[in-house]
Each structure stands twice: as structure tokens, then as C-alpha cells.
Amino acid sequence: MKNGTVKWFNADKGYGFITGEDGNDVFVHFSAIQTDGFKTLEEGQKVTFDEESSDRGPQAANVVPQ
């Protein structure tokens, strides 16, 4: 698991970006958020996540808000 901070997240569109501790931005889709109910993130929120490779670059998986 990696630590990161939500750079931005658009709840209407269901995606955004997390900035990892290494300074790299990672795409996050709402389906990767591990919470009950409405899955959203807030700018500046701390999260842990797994990083996976996709056709479009790094993508977050198993995102857990802190």
C-alpha cells in the first residue's frame, strides 16, 4: 500500500487524481474507493492505495480514505 493525498476528485464524473508520496499523480475511479455508501473523495484528503498499471498510465486500486 502507498500513501497519498487527493489532488482533486469530481464526484459528478466519478474520477480524479491522487498525488503519491513520490510526487507522481495517479488516476482514481470511484469504483476503487473502499467505503460503504456514496464513494467520493475530498481534495487534500489522505488515502492509502495500491498502484496498478493501465493502458493510460498508473491507476489507483483499493483506495482507503484515512
Curated annotation (Swiss-Prot):
What conditions trigger expression of this protein?
In response to low temperature.
Identify the PROSITE patterns for this entry. CSD_1, CSD_2
Enumerate the GO terms in the molecular function aspect.
DNA binding
Spell out the InterPro entries in the cross-references: Cold_shock_CspA, Cold_shock_domain, CSD, CSD_CS, CSP_DNA-bd, NA-bd_OB-fold
SUPFAM superfamilies given in the database record? Nucleic acid-binding proteins
Q: Keywords for this entry?
A: Activator, Cytoplasm, DNA-binding, Stress response, Transcription, Transcription regulation
Q: Where is each CSD domain found?
A: 4-63
One Pfam family matching this protein: CSD
The organism's superkingdom is given as Bacteria
Q: Which SMART domains has this protein been placed in?
A: CSP (SM00357)
Q: Where in the cell is it found?
A: Cytoplasm
Annotated spans, Disordered: 47-66
Report the GO terms under cellular component.
cytoplasm
Instruction: Kindly list the cysteine pairs connected by disulfide bridges.
Output: none
Does the keyword Cell division belong to this entry?
Answer: no
Protein's name according to its UniProt entry:
Cold shock protein 1
Q: Which gene encodes it?
A: csp
